[in-house]
Curated annotation (Swiss-Prot):
It catalyses: a plastoquinone + NADH + (n+1) H(+)(in) = a plastoquinol + NAD(+) + n H(+)(out); a plastoquinone + NADPH + (n+1) H(+)(in) = a plastoquinol + NADP(+) + n H(+)(out). One of its GO terms (cellular component) is chloroplast thylakoid membrane. Coiled coil: none annotated. It is a peripheral membrane protein. NDH shuttles electrons from NAD(P)H:plastoquinone, via FMN and iron-sulfur (Fe-S) centers, to quinones in the photosynthetic chain and possibly in a chloroplast respiratory chain. The immediate electron acceptor for the enzyme in this species is believed to be plastoquinone. Couples the redox reaction to proton translocation, and thus conserves the redox energy in a proton gradient. This is NAD(P)H-quinone oxidoreductase subunit H, chloroplastic. PROSITE patterns: COMPLEX1_49K. It comes from the Eukaryota. Keywords: Chloroplast, Membrane, NAD, NADP, Plastid, Plastoquinone, Quinone, Thylakoid, Translocase, Transport. It is an enzyme of class 7 (translocase). Belongs to the complex I 49 kDa subunit family.
Length: 393
C-alpha cells in the first residue's frame, strides 16, 4: 500500500472575534495552505448598534453624545461632522475663535488616534516597547482634553455654531508646552523604529497598494496618501480655518505597510505645526454663535419665550432641518469621514448615512493578504488602522 508522503489539505482557521490582534471584534475566516494564505473573509457586525437608525429618532443635539462611540479614539472628528452637516444646511456661521478652537481639538485628537495606532501596531509585529511609550504621551493629551472639555474620552464638546465652552485660563500655554515636548518624542520614536532592521523586515514590501488601485477601492486618508496620491480634505475642501496655516500634505509613493507608517508618523509632526500656529494666533471673540441658539419658533405665542421643546421626554433645541440633502466630510485620522444628511422640515433627520473610513479601507484586506504568509495578516491589518465601532456602526 503506497502512502503519499505529503497531504495537500487546506486548513480553515478562525481569527477573532476575540483575538488580541483583531483591534476589536473582527473575525477573519482564513484559508491556509501551510503558512500561505489562500483566502481571507472578514466577518463584520459584532459591534453593530444601529447608529444610523438612532439618528433618525433624535434631534442633532440629542444625537451628539452617541456619535463619539463610532471612532472612540478620535471622537472630535465624529462630533465635527455631526455639527458641520446642520451648520451647512442652516447656513450658520461659526465665529473665528470657535473655528480655531475646533482645529486645535481636531489636531490633538488626530495625534491621540495616531499614537494609539502606533503602539498596538508595533506590538502586533513583535515590538512591545513603543506600546508603553505612546501611553506616556497620550496621557498628556488626555489631560489637555479633560481640562478643556471635562472628559478624557467621549468629549461631547462641539456644538452647532461653535463649541460648548471656551478654553480655560492657562490651557494654551500648557498645550504649547506639550507641542515642544512631543516633537522630541516623535524624534525618539523615529530613532527607535524607523531604521530598525527587524521592523523593516516585517513591513517593507508587505501589503503593497498602487495609486490607481487605491483610488478604485475608494481608500482614503493615510492608506491613499501612502500610495502616492496627495489627497487631504483639509487642503481640498478648505473647511474650518486650515487655509490660514502653513503645513504640507504628507505622502509616500511605495504603497506598502512601511509607507503607511511613515505617513502617520509625519502627520503627527504636521499636526504639531498646525497646533503651534493656531495656539499662537487664536483670535478673541465668542466661542459660539449665539444667533444659532435663536432657532425658528412657531408664531404660536406659547413658544415665544422658549428655546426648548420637550421631545421624547428630553429638552432639545428646536433646530429644524430644511427639506434638502447634502454630503459633508472631514479628514479623520483614518480617512474620509462623511455624512449624507437628508432633512425633511423636521427636527429629526429623515436619513443620516455614515461613510466610515475604516469600513471602506477594510474592504481591500482580503485582496492584500492573499498569497502572503499567515504572520503578515497582522502587519497588513495593523497598517490599515481600523476601529470596529465605526466599521460596524
Amino acid at each position: 500500500m503506497n502512502v503519499p508522503a505529503t497531504r495537500k489539505d487546506l486548513m480553515i482557521v478562525n481569527m477573532g472575534p476575540h483575538h488580541p490582534s483583531m483591534h476589536g471584534v473582527l473575525r477573519l475566516i482564513v484559508t491556509l495552505d501551510g503558512e500561505d494564505v489562500i483566502d481571507c473573509e472578514p466577518v463584520l457586525g459584532y459591534l453593530h448598534r444601529g447608529m444610523e437608525k438612532i439618528a433618525e429618532n433624535r434631534t442633532i443635539i440629542q444625537y451628539l453624545p452617541y456619535v463619539t462611540r463610532w471612532d472612540y479614539l478620535a471622537t472630535m472628528f465624529t462630533e465635527a461632522i455631526t455639527v458641520n452637516a446642520p451648520e451647512q444646511l442652516g447656513n450658520i456661521q461659526v465665529p473665528k475663535r470657535a473655528s480655531y478652537i475646533r482645529v486645535i481639538m481636531l489636531e490633538l485628537s488626530r495625534i491621540a488616534s495616531h499614537l494609539l495606532w502606533l503602539g498596538p501596531f508595533m506590538a502586533d509585529i513583535g515590538a512591545q516597547t513603543p506600546f508603553f511609550y505612546i501611553f506616556r504621551e497620550r496621557e498628556l493629551l488626555y489631560d489637555l482634553f479633560e481640562a478643556a472639555t471635562g472628559m478624557r474620552m467621549m468629549h461631547n464638546y462641539f456644538r452647532i455654531g461653535g463649541v460648548a465652552a471656551d478654553l480655560p485660563h492657562g490651557w494654551i500655554d500648557k498645550c504649547l508646552d506639550f507641542c515642544d515636548y512631543f516633537l522630541t518624542g516623535v524624534v525618539e520614536y523615529q530613532k527607535l523604529i524607523t531604521r530598525n532592521p527587524i521592523f523593516l523586515e516585517r513591513v517593507e514590501g508587505v501589503g503593497i497598494i498602487g495609486g490607481e488601485e487605491a483610488i478604485n477601492w475608494g481608500l482614503s486618508g493615510p492608506m491613499l496618501r501612502a500610495s502616492g496620491i496627495q489627497w487631504d480634505l483639509r487642503k481640498v475642501d478648505h473647511y474650518e480655518c486650515y487655509d490660514e496655516f502653513d503645513w504640507q500634505v504628507q505622502w509616500q509613493k511605495e504603497g506598502d505597510s512601511l509607507a503607511r507608517y511613515l505617513v502617520r508618523i509625519s502627520e503627527m509632526t504636521e499636526s504639531i505645526k498646525i497646533l503651534q500656529q493656531a495656539l499662537e494666533g487664536i483670535p478673541g471673540g465668542p466661542y459660539e454663535n449665539l444667533e444659532g441658539r435663536r432657532f425658528d419658533r412657531e408664531s404660536d405665542s406659547e413658544w415665544n419665550d422658549f428655546d426648548y421643546r420637550f421631545i421624547s421626554k428630553k429638552p432639545s433645541p428646536t433646530f429644524e432641518l430644511s427639506k434638502q440633502e447634502l454630503y459633508v466630510r472631514v479628514e479623520a485620522p483614518k480617512g474620509e469621514l462623511g455624512i449624507f444628511l437628508i432633512g425633511d422640515n423636521s427636527v429629526f433627520p429623515w436619513r443620516w448615512k455614515i461613510r466610515p473610513p475604516g469600513f471602506i479601507n477594510l474592504q481591500i484586506l482580503p485582496h492584500l493578504v492573499k498569497r502572503m504568509k499567515l504572520a503578515d495578516i497582522m502587519t497588513i491589518l495593523g497598517s490599515i488602522d481600523i476601529i470596529m465601532g465605526e466599521v460596524d456602526r
